Amino acid sequence: MEQSSGRVNPEQPNNVLASLVGSIVEKGISENKPPSKPLPPRPSLLSFPVARHRSHGPHLAPVGSSIAQPKDYNDDQEEEEAEERFMNADSIAAFAKPLQRKEKKDMDLGRWKDMVSGDDPASTHVPQQSRKLKIIETRPPYVASADAATTSSNTLLAARASDQREFVSDKAPFIKNLGTKERVPLNASPPLAVSNGLGTRHASSSLESDIDVENHAKLQTMSPDEIAEAQAELLDKMDPALLSILKKRGEAKLKKRKHSVQGVSITDETAKNSRTEGHFVTPKVMAIPKEKSVVQKPGIAQGFVWDAWTERVEAARDLRFSFDGNVVEEDVVSPAETGGKWSGVESAAERDFLRTEGDPGAAGYTIKEAIALARSVIPGQRCLALHLLASVLDKALNKLCQSRIGYAREEKDKSTDWEAIWAYALGPEPELVLALRMALDDNHASVVIACVKVIQCLLSCSLNENFFNILENMGPHGKDIFTASVFRSKPEIDLGFLRGCYWKYSAKPSNIVAFREEILDDGTEDTDTIQKDVFVAGQDVAAGLVRMDILPRIYHLLETEPTAALEDSIISVTIAIARHSPKCTTAILKYPKFVQTIVKRFQLNKRMDVLSSQINSVRLLKVLARYDQSTCMEFVKNGTFNAVTWHLFQFTSSLDSWVKLGKQNCKLSSTLMVEQLRFWKVCIHSGCCVSRFPELFPALCLWLSCPSFEKLREKNLISEFTSVSNEAYLVLEAFAETLPNMYSQNIPRNESGTWDWSYVSPMIDSALSWITLAPQLLKWEKGIESVSVSTTTLLWLYSGVMRTISKVLEKISAEGEEEPLPWLPEFVPKIGLAIIKHKLLSFSVADVSRFGKDSSRCSSFMEYLCFLRERSQDDELALASVNCLHGLTRTIVSIQNLIESARSKMKAPHQVSISTGDESVLANGILAESLAELTSVSCSFRDSVSSEWPIVQSIELHKRGGLAPGVGLGWGASGGGFWSTRVLLAQAGAGLLSLFLNISLSDSQNDQGSVGFMDKVNSALAMCLIAGPRDYLLVERAFEYVLRPHALEHLACCIKSNKKNISFEWECSEGDYHRMSSMLASHFRHRWLQQKGRSIAEEGVSGVRKGTVGLETIHEDGEMSNSSTQDKKSDSSTIEWAHQRMPLPPHWFLSAISAVHSGKTSTGPPESTELLEVAKAGVFFLAGLESSSGFGSLPSPVVSVPLVWKFHALSTVLLVGMDIIEDKNTRNLYNYLQELYGQFLDEARLNHRDTELLRFKSDIHENYSTFLEMVVEQYAAVSYGDVVYGRQVSVYLHQCVEHSVRLSAWTVLSNARVLELLPSLDKCLGEADGYLEPVEENEAVLEAYLKSWTCGALDRAATRGSVAYTLVVHHFSSLVFCNQAKDKVSLRNKIVKTLVRDLSRKRHREGMMLDLLRYKKGSANAMEEEVIAAETEKRMEVLKEGCEGNSTLLLELEKLKSAALCGRR
């Protein structure tokens, strides 16, 4: 049914219906004459798109009513009455009841926590049943007159401004208030609902409402005396205490309601009872205490971090924002200006609409208010709200990127918490995704484009593209990564509770239902609901948008010929969706004619000028082509590739034709050509278009050659030109990857399917032209003064040039790997001479001695690059420098290897007269001559990597990969998290350091025991902690370096030379080192680099039959697949965060001894002998790392691992069996680690006031008691009292262990009756004071001691002198005889009476009681006999006092005293 526009024609008196729609405000020009004075607007805005009530018109009366009857049926009087009713319809509409959505009473962040960790939406949406008070609101009586119609708005405003009066029929305190403060006059009319600003509603028509109305009518008929009498009768029947509680609560609620301001707490009952008649509930929050710290310290449980974060997010609910995205401070707008009555979500639109004077939006808007305003019936208000949301999200992202990585917000920090704002906006309460999806269907173009802008901010389109643009320039792997938010799966007991588990998608791919119609082909009923869509959006906003069918809407917008701005924005959104996950990429590819529409829109512009949407179109196709090889081949086959890359061939003659386009057009054309060349690169990597090199190379010659920079500098086009040139060289690098073997015989050029070496020589000449001009362009001799705006793009260009040259040189190899080269291509020494001549390297010792010390001048290009890396504040400039260093280093290493290989072919040294110094350097070895400078660069990056890995590790603070769901840069983490340029810079530095480690392999064979070698080992360990999902090769190289036999031999030397070791014996042959190296490398590679097999549902199989439950359960922790690391989507150039483990946790090296008892990490159950061998090698490796950690000059990552993890690993390895400590070498190593960690524990205990240093339950796992049961069960079954095994078990009785774990350990040991198997106190780890001090004060632990005493679990322990017996005697003696605290009297008396009563029943424990009576810590035998007698007498008095006069117990004490005096035990 169409609605009227609201315009009334005065010449048509019969057009009465149209005049009744005045409350629907729309744009338009009224046909009436403008009044002399503007009429006030009507505040009848409705929530959009909630259905309007029929009273808002058109007014078609039901059949049978007087309005619907024919004209001749009504007489004049009835017609007049009907007309009068129509005239008063506006006032009637004020009390109409529109359709209501389900109300959310308050924000519950616990629901969010359940949502992000669970998979069933039904479990998160169960309403909490609570007792609700019945509310009756007074309203003015309805008067059916013309005056009432004209004054309806004023009446509604007056009703809103008036205080609401509440009546509760079944609660006496409220009836009392009714008769005193808020008594209703006898002539008052029945209560009606009050307008809420966005809609009105009647009182409920339920039975409770009817009873309410009846009670209220009864009250009207009663006199004041009768009301007072009824009140007194009710008060007499109620409990006074209950009455007092209810009265205080009512007064507190009234006081808070009157004086509430932003941030003031309010009880849940008040929040539920205030404005419950509105469409939205006014958000009220509890007062949030400031957290002390959000940094995850070893002693802070994960639950505390989550609670602190939840409080921060809740605080963001009441923040108000201006239209520029800034937070409106509380003191900017006074309460009198904003008005307390305009503080709720339901009144934001009416506030702005009514307050035409001044600035209606000066008070700002909360996020929920802005979302509510986005559903207004006025398009202008919808646009305004969406622009505000875009500003807030954009501001939040920019602020997050400006903050530090791993930044911990402290209590004193009063700045705006943008992390919490971003998380709240994307959270489940505002339902932003649902509002945006509905706004995208708006019929106003301005609203749609404003909505798309918000989605762009929501998906961080611009920031993510900047990140991927840098990623394109980096090498050498060149892989993209999907942006879907992820979280770590929970640690498992079978894997030793180690962190660093597999990443999982926040929203399961199976829940991203892109096309509902495909699932409904079998005729089943669609059970998907908006609730499920919102649930998925709460886990991942991009997944929620796809599930809400955003792709069909985007396709429809593209088909309707949108504006250039809208087209560019929606394609940008599509790129973000394609980058999200494989499921989203597949959804775009499978959508009918989606790609064809993109290509068609690209081809509509036949002119030479470039549109921004064309750039995004090519970028989208490139992202889709990266997904898999078949997609790329299809694009080439169906002509899509050719249709979008023709611009590359338009500038082939000279540079002038391009420069004449102008600055803006040149910028757009260069950006388009860059994307087209990247599309070429993707196709080449997929094996397509390689044979088309002769066609492409002439078009690239303009950009490959060095141009006239005076013309470019004059037009300010250096950055635009060099960006195209850089990408052109990267395309040549991709072509170089496909070069055939140079020395293979008879390879036909046209039949090989690839380009050949005949094109390499002109390509090298073009590259050398850039090297020749490098000193003039970069001017590195001036140092820091040479840095300009174009320096970054020039360095990216030189990085591409060096990468291309190094790739060509690496492809030159003989047919056999060990065979020498038959001959050397002439361009190899040509490249070397160019590098030497133009001072890309320094060969002077004097220059190297001042390396990096003088910022005003640099002696070489390498020094200049290293200087920029250390001193530059621009991360992209530093990244370009590191990549340029990487390419240069690879080039000189390849030149050195090729020349040496060619020389080895010569039978006798070839005597050639060397004419120049440059040729002399090349003959002596370019790498050897520049080794001093390379060493300086290596040391610089070694220090850098050692300082960067803690920053990368600090990002994983919360349970999920980021602080909020969605594709936001870094998933909402501070500084961008894993997606920041700072992390990219650290990973690039680690990659360069890996190259330097490979260079130094040949030199490290003779530096056994040196500090330099240990620095390299520590830097390799740090590299493992920095590497991301794209850096598998980097981690494998680090494993190879640390685990090679020579490195293991060096670790053995460090163990033997460790001064902390008391006695140690080690026997191992060279073959043993090779065997351990192989086993450890295989284990670590399989444990940390093996990807997880994906289930069928995650592969995106279409046609899944939907049942009654839409969000089905998928078993996340299935068995590993048989595929290797590279088998997972090997043809894809985009990798996933999910299904892999990197970045590795700091304690990754403990996995060899922490997870050996489980077969989950392999394809089948491993053999027990293999497990044992891995465990033995793991114990040796751990001992070596611990011993060598103090030898290097750099801090070792091993030292940073908390001691609790190391003790836990030593306990875990014992689950393999006794074989692990029956082997002589392994037993010595295990004993050595115990002694070492015991010393570390004593040092930490003396240096820290906090006694609980070993928090096994808090730091390892909350169910650690289960693990303890396994350890004790193994100890009781196979140990036979082994001292080494017993020492490890006794660690859990140390006073540095948290009391809950001590209690669990003691209980398990006591129940298993193995307390007597524990060693004596002098044989335990560490000093004895660690077990005895501080004195035990936990009552649960003391009661466990007492229970073990009385049940006989300590009888044998007393005979054998077990540490368990010593602990009990010491703590009982300290509590009973030394602790005189009054709060311990009852516990002391309980222990005394229980011990004496037990003695009366079991006389054989008299010796144990005498030990308790005579015990004195550490010096019992040194005491004189008189002192002993006096002390015994004093202690007997304490025991008698504890018996509290019990004659039976006192008699037993007399017997004990006699035995003590006689010296009898």
From Swiss-Prot:
One of its GO terms (biological process) is cell differentiation. It holds the Pfam family RPAP1_C. InterPro entries: ARM-type_fold, MINIYO, RNA_pol_II_AP1_C, RNA_pol_II_AP1_N. GO terms for cellular component: cytoplasm; nucleus. It comes from the Eukaryota. SUPFAM superfamilies: ARM repeat. It is found in: Cytoplasm; Nucleus. Residues 27-85, 186-211, 1113-1135 are annotated as: Disordered. Its main location: cytoplasm. Expressed in root and shoot apices and in leaf and flower primordia. Detected in the endosperm, embryo, meristems and in organ primordia, but not in mature cells. Found exclusively in the vascular bundles in mature leaves. Interacts with HAG3, NRPB3 and NRPB10L. Positive regulator of transcriptional elongation that is essential for cells to initiate differentiation. Interacts with RNA polymerase II and the Elongator complex and is required to sustain global levels of transcriptional elongation activity, specifically in differentiating tissues. Belongs to the RPAP1 family. This is Transcriptional elongation regulator MINIYO. It comes from Arabidopsis thaliana.
